[in-house]
Amino acid sequence: MAKLLYIKANPKSDQSSRTFIISEHFIKVYKEFHPNDQIITLDLYKEGIHFLSQEDINDIFAPKTEASKHHPILKYAYQFLEADKYVFAAPMWNLGIPAILKAYIDYITVSGITFKYTEQGAVGLLRGKKAVHIMATGGEYKTPPFSDFEMANRYLKTILGFMGVEDFQTITAQRLDIVGEDVEKIISNALKEAEEIAKRF
């Protein structure tokens, strides 16, 4: 039985968020094809994720003990470590990821838990795990010059790669706010892509 961590980074409801419309469909299909897997939903806004304080930073860099697994910040890093698969439902906001997702990433990118330092430098500890990022965008960022502006999916792929996650896929619904676009068709195509990836994820 695999453990999937479903991370939601949008204050909108499942019905009003275009990202969540796609991600919820992904999860629905995933459940159908992986009925024995455990799915843990982590809504970052409901969790009350905040920016790290000086005290938090001190705790993160302190030696890890058995009690660290129950620390209010470090518990998220251990939860991330224990999962086998990750689904990130996070829209693009102003070319990047929502700030709350960046704050969460600061919670989980912890030396001694999700990566470690060696004589050769940093080494990720999440080898063999896989992730998918589901993202809706108002504009189009697949081709130049706008592809250079895209710093949401690229960042997420990079930081997860730093932690050892090499199997990374992306499902995007782009051009949703461009005048004249068929939004229903764009979302429909994204739902179909999500369905196919969910079956084999």
Curated annotation (Swiss-Prot):
Catalytic activity: 2 a quinone + NADH + H(+) = 2 a 1,4-benzosemiquinone + NAD(+); N,N-dimethyl-1,4-phenylenediamine + anthranilate + 2 NAD(+) = 2-(4-dimethylaminophenyl)diazenylbenzoate + 2 NADH + 2 H(+)
Record flagged with keyword Ligase: no
EC number: 1.6.5.-, 1.7.1.17
Molecular function terms from GO: electron transfer activity; FMN binding; oxidoreductase activity, acting on NAD(P)H as acceptor; oxidoreductase activity, acting on NAD(P)H, quinone or similar compound as acceptor
Binding-site residues, FMN: 92-95
Superkingdom in the source lineage: Bacteria
Subunit structure: Homodimer.
Family the entry assigns: Belongs to the azoreductase type 1 family.
Function: Quinone reductase that provides resistance to thiol-specific stress caused by electrophilic quinones. Also exhibits azoreductase activity. Catalyzes the reductive cleavage of the azo bond in aromatic azo compounds to the corresponding amines.
Protein name, UniProt field: FMN-dependent NADH:quinone oxidoreductase
Organism: Caldicellulosiruptor saccharolyticus (strain ATCC 43494 / DSM 8903 / Tp8T 6331)
Gene name as annotated: azoR
